[in-house]
A protein has these predicted regions:
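Short loop/turn motifs enriched for small/polar and acidic residues
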Residues: 17-19, 48, 101-103
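Non-cysteine beta-strand/loop elements that form the S-adenosyl-L-methionine
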Residues: 39-49
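Short, small-residue-biased leader/transition segments that mark boundaries at the very start
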Residues: 2-4
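Hydrophobic faces of well-ordered beta-strands that scaffold small-molecule active sites
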Residues: 12-18, 44-45
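Catalytic cores of alpha/beta
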Residues: 20-37
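Terminal RNA-binding accessory module
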Residues: 58-155
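Short, charge-patterned binding micro-sites
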Residues: 48-56
Length: 155
């Protein structure tokens, strides 16, 4: 809550393990509620898999593989919805700083790309020459499946 209060545009990442032995549907619903309540913009959600010789592999109430995968998919969908909303909210920002991580040719189909200060993937609508590996002030213009499309802001 303090982070959100101090930085209203705040994104959070997490690793989420689903299907650990003993996990119930109530646990899944609780996890989904946590996902809804946090400003998650990224999560690595993965199903538990038993590793021979570990304590967890010997625990009772092992969750079946199909159930583990289904639960992980539900949580991924919840995180995806949060991420999409966060990316769309980025369009309300007047200005972002993007750290460019490549300097491709201006004619490249993928253009220059990087991340903003909240690690939102961004792609320059019109690539700039000689602007690789640097911070660029930009204005968000639209959202794509892969992130936010931006254009440079000149002082």
């Amino acid at each position: 809550e303090m982070c959100i209060r101090d930085r209203p545009r705040f994104g959070l990442g997490a690793d989420i393990l689903m299907g650990f032995p003993g996990e119930t549907e109530a646990h899944v619903l609780e996890t989904l509620e946590v996902v809804r309540s946090l400003p998650l913009t990224y999560a690595h959600v993965f199903p538990y898999s038993a590793r021979p010789g570990t304590v967890a592999a010997e625990l009772p109430d092992q969750v079946g593989k199909a159930v583990r995968q289904e639960r992980a998919a539900r949580v991924r969908a919840g995180v995806e919805a949060k991420r999409e909303a966060f990316w769309k909210d980025t369009l309300t920002c007047e200005r972002l700083l993007v750290a460019l991580d490549c300097n491709e040719d201006a004619g490249s189909a993928s253009g220059q790309h990087g991340v903003d200060e909240c690690y939102v993937p961004c792609r320059l609508r019109t690539p700039l020459r000689g602007e690789g590996h640097t911070l660029i002030p930009v204005r968000p213009v639209s959202v794509s499946r892969k992130g936010v499309i931006v254009e440079p802001v000149r002082p």
